[in-house]
Amino acid sequence: MLFRSCTYPKYKNGWRVKASPNGVLTDENGTEYNYLYWEGETNARFDFSKGFCVKGGDTAAFLETALEKLGLNRREANEFIVFWLPLMEQNPYNVISFQADCYTQAAKLEVEPAPDTVIRVFMAWQKSDAFVGIAEQALTAPERRGFTVVEWGGTEISTGDEN
């Protein structure tokens, strides 16, 4: 289950925008957006059976490599990194797992007309004071072709959270 706690522009039974080839989104009033934003809460249980344990100071370099493997272009990866890095780089370690099934099941996405390519990157992460051994996660991306929809986000799992 997902509850949207904040959206921009306002989410009224969905967003109605037209996507231009350059990525600009235009609503029915002619207002242009570079992206749509939503924040929410879910009771989804995130899977940390595979992932990475990264030193805080190595987080930017790790994310640059990981996000490229997951299919984000340079601009998208830059936006992702500048959003998350201030919360992560000072930690001794970050345990990171990119969620696929659990995220896409919790946060359904419907786009009309259907895109040729959908890239959804969702990072669950947790601060750690010590190195944590974790099976390495394989990172892959679909081939970008035609009309491509990109969504990225993440969540910090606080110590003591059961997710």
What does each of the following model-derived ranges do?
Residues 1-163:
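Protease-labile, long low-complexity intrinsically disordered regions enriched in Pro/Ser/Thr
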